[in-house]
């Protein structure tokens, strides 16, 4: 299903960023939260891999844009994820960098937020 592919794309990107940016002896976190906000189901997926460079954050949903080595990334995963959420599911997908606290420790990383309209 397309929605599962979106979630897997985001989680796999977070995993890759964690492996690249966080040493083996540090916490590697991917936190997923689901909640309702107004008439939307909101799904937040965040990691502690130090965030997306602010110089490129506005480009990551563009087709063929990748920061990975050519053998690892095609640059279409996040583009297709955005297309699925916005065009097929009539939702919204955003990315931002965020600070958060988990188990009394402070972290910084990328946060992908999916808004999906729901009927009440």
Q: Which stretches of residues belong to each language-model region?
A:
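A residue-level detector for a conserved hydrophobic packing site
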Residues: 3-4
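Short helix-loop "hinge" at the ATP-lid/N-box region of the Bergerat-fold HATPase_c
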Residues: 13-18
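Short beta-strand/loop element within the Bergerat-fold HATPase_c
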Residues: 25-39
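Acidic ATP/Mg2+-coordinating residue in the GHKL
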Residues: 47
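Glycine-rich ATP-binding loops of the HATPase_c
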Residues: 89-103
